[in-house]
Amino acid sequence: MLTPILATDDPYQAATVFVEAGWSLVFATPRDCGDPLTCVALAGARVMLGTSLPQFLPVQSRAHKGAGIEFHLTVPAADIDAIYQAHSQHADSVTGIAQQPWGERAFHAVLLGYRFLIAADQAEPPPDSGN
């Protein structure tokens, strides 16, 4: 399993943003421990939220945080609409949910400057397929 650690201004507030968008909180270190770190999950995919101190995110790089990277998450097909609705209400920006040219039903969301492509699991029949 690969778990990215994303630089944030406040990992605890960042976790709140993700949880409001439908993710679950896996853990949060104590605020006074000296190592601010949280972890959130969506459909089994985890993302850790760390600090943006200069040793993790140099000041000159802050304007480009998340540039050139998009995280692809596969979620259960039965959950994609609810996940889309939660992200529509709480993400920085969200595209419409649509059938992608490569066959996935998916949407793009930006949370705290990081891009996510959230797609329905193609191994599962769509909720309205009658299977």
Report the location of each language-model feature.
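Short glycine-/small-residue motifs
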Residues: 115-119
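Ser/Thr-Pro-rich, acidic low-complexity intrinsically disordered regions of eukaryotic RNA-binding
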Residues: 15, 80-81
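Conserved active-site tyrosine of GNAT-family acetyltransferases
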Residues: 14-20, 87, 113-114
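Vicinal oxygen chelate
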Residues: 1-5, 24-75, 82-110, 120-131
